[in-house]
């Protein structure tokens, strides 16, 4: 598309997605769920997440590829949920909600991946590096599988949304953790956080 905006009105399941219009925008629409089983490539034009969910299902070293600034997050959720390794190889990209699910290593380049909403760790998926958390972002563990926290749980944690244990899988801390002033730790009813004998420090001291 060379100009204007095309907005999706229904859910889409397809192979890859290439954004390569000279000046146009593809808007993923309102509260939809899209499943792409191939690589997402951002070359030209704009991909606007709207308020929809984009599931990236491909096992690839270029699962999210191209020029990250071609993506406008809106209030969308982008989920990397293949059963295996996936790489976010695009240049610096800002997401709203960002989900890493199913299994495998989701490879990020430090400084190239920012989340302003919820970063959700699901299943047994892990990340190679922590995303950059926006001011009001949060980290959520939403899994029924027991797991040990990884590099995604940075310390000190300064994003005001804090850290939430949201499902029945026991989350075990991997190191001592510090929460800055006014940053919460939420352990929902029926969930379990195992400190592993590491210290939790609140309020930055």
Name what the model sees in each region.
Residues 1-205:
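Sequence/structural signature of small/polar-enriched beta-strand/turn repeats
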């Amino acid at each position: 598309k060379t100009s204007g905006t095309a907005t999706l009105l229904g859910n889409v399941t397809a192979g890859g997605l290439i954004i390569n219009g000279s000046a146009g925008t593809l808007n993923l629409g309102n509260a939809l769920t899209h499943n792409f089983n191939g690589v997402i490539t951002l070359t030209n034009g704009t991909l606007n997440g709207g308020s929809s969910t984009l599931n990236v299902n491909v096992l690839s070293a270029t699962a999210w590829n191209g020029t990250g600034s071609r993506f406008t997050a809106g209030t969308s959720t982008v989920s990397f949920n293949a059963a295996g390794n996936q790489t976010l190889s695009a240049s610096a990209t800002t997401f709203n909600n960002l989900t890493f699910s199913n299994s495998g290593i989701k490879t990020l380049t430090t400084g190239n991946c920012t989340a302003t909403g919820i970063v959700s760790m699901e299943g047994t998926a892990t990340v190679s590096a922590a995303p950059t958390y926006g001011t009001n972002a949060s980290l959520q563990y939403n899994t029924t599988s027991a797991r040990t926290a990884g590099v995604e749980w940075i310390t000190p944690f300064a994003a005001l949304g804090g850290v939430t244990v949201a499902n029945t899988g026991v989350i075990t801390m991997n190191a001592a953790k510090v929460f800055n002033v006014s940053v919460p730790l939420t352990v929902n009813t029926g969930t379990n956080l195992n400190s592993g004998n590491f210290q939790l420090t609140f309020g930055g001291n």
